[in-house]
């Protein structure tokens, strides 16, 4: 029961914060003709004798609706047909998506994400303290989230943890883990933004 209440609190925090920031909630189709973005395999199905897929992202619809509302968000399931044997992947999950128009830089997005986390953590402390105690959960400090450039992050991990850089254009799972470890040791933060990710991997 407590886990479901915490899940409720996170989604509630997401909605409440974005409403306060002038966002409009949208509801997009989950059955489509094609995928919205590359890099993910699709669950394919027969839709009344026509090929269709389960959507792996609302990206296309979000970008369309930004032209109407400027700021939009959605809380909904997404589906990714990727075979895996790790704790890092899910074939179905609830995605918290938002899209903004007319921003000055990616730092505007980072500020919005930081604001959401700060708002939601305070909401959980205030309204879900009982559930947090049952689960023996200590919420992370999100008063400030550090940022590090992609190339600098790769270099720091290589120097501090003796890991050879094998792929200069992407982060390997172990590197992601070590960047998180570096952020905790260097800034005492459980979160970190990695900026200036190579555009060829986007």
Can you say where each PLM-predicted feature lies in the sequence?
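His/Asp/Glu-rich mid-to-C-terminal helical/loop segments that flank catalytic regions of hydrolases
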Residues: 69, 96, 104-126
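A generic alpha-helix structural signal
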Residues: 15, 110-113, 154
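Metal-assisted phosphate- and nucleotidyl-transfer catalytic regions
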Residues: 28, 36-41, 115-202
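Short, mixed-charge, low-aromatic patches
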Residues: 66-76, 111, 134, 192, ...
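Class II aminoacyl-tRNA synthetase-like tRNA-binding/catalytic domains
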Residues: 1-103
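Hydrophobic alpha-helical scaffolding
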Residues: 4, 52, 65, 99-110, ...
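Low-complexity, flexible helical/coil segments
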Residues: 61-64, 91, 108-113, 130-137
């Amino acid at each position: 029961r407590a886990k479901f209440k915490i899940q409720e609190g996170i989604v509630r925090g997401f909605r409440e914060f974005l409403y306060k920031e002038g966002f409009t909630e949208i509801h997009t189709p989950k059955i489509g003709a094609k995928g919205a973005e590359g890099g993910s395999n699709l669950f394919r199905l027969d839709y009344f004798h026509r090929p269709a897929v389960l959507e792996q992202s609302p990206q296309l619809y979000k970008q369309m609706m930004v032209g109407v509302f400027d700021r939009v968000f959605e809380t909904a399931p997404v589906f990714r047909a990727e075979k895996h044997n790790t704790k890092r992947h899910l074939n179905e999950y609830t995605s918290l998506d938002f899209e903004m128009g007319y921003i000055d830089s990616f730092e505007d997005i980072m500020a919005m994400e930081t604001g959401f986390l700060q708002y939601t953590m305070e909401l959980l402390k205030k309204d879900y303290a009982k559930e947090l105690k049952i689960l023996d959960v200590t919420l992370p400090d999100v008063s400030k989230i550090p940022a590090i450039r992609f190339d600098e992050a790769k270099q720091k991990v290589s120097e501090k943890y003796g890991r050879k850089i094998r792929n200069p254009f992407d982060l390997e799972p172990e590197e992601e883990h070590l960047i998180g470890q570096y952020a905790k040791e260097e800034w005492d933060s459980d979160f970190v933004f990695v900026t200036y990710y190579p555009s060829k991997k986007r």
